[in-house]
Amino acid sequence: MKSLSFIRHAKSDWTSPLVSDHDRRLADKGQRASTIIKDFFETANKNFDSVFSSTALRAVETIEIIKPSLKDTEIMYKKDLYTFDDHMMLEFISKIKDDISSVLIVGHNPAIQETVLRLSDTEQNSNLLNRVEHKYPTAAFCTLTSTIDKWSHTGDTMFKIKEFICPKEL
């Protein structure tokens, strides 16, 4: 059984047009949303075998706020996750070591939303699937589960959406 979770980075600051996309920081709203997700993780006792994050500053700041709720789980920052493409995201997932059962990825849209939709079984809980399809807001958290035993077997419609949580709901 594999568990694949995603967080879209929290709301970033667009006030400085001279800052590169990779170097944009979190806005105050993004910091608050990240704290809400951190509190949710603590309350729900969320655990992950591995955590991977994009190297973009807004993703790094998002996971650094959440980090205290992750106990001793190491966070690995991967340039490959600074992507907006679901094919690149799936390639990254397929290379995860098989002894890792539960993964959290902090990244970007549309890659996260498209990956979740692509991997999700369309005959499952349509409410969760419809919500993800409608919008994957900043700082939203989603978990997918599958009976596959190797990450390289990850493919279309092989996962079920277990939960989809937005900070505004908490």
Segments from the language model and where they lie:
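Active-site-proximal alpha-helix that buttresses catalytic centers in soluble enzyme cores
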Residues: 2-84, 121, 136
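Residue-level preference for the first positions of well-ordered beta-strands
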Residues: 4, 102-104, 141
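Short, glycine/serine-rich, charged loops/turns that create anion-binding
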Residues: 11, 56-58, 110, 148, ...
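Glycine-rich phosphate-binding loop signature in dinucleotide/nucleotide-binding domains
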Residues: 44-46, 95-101
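Functional cleft and adjacent loop/helix regions within the main domain
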Residues: 76, 82-84, 149-170
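Short phosphate-binding loop-to-helix
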Residues: 81-98
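A glycine-rich beta-strand to alpha-helix segment
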Residues: 101-120
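Domain-level recognition of soluble alpha/beta enzyme cores
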Residues: 123-162
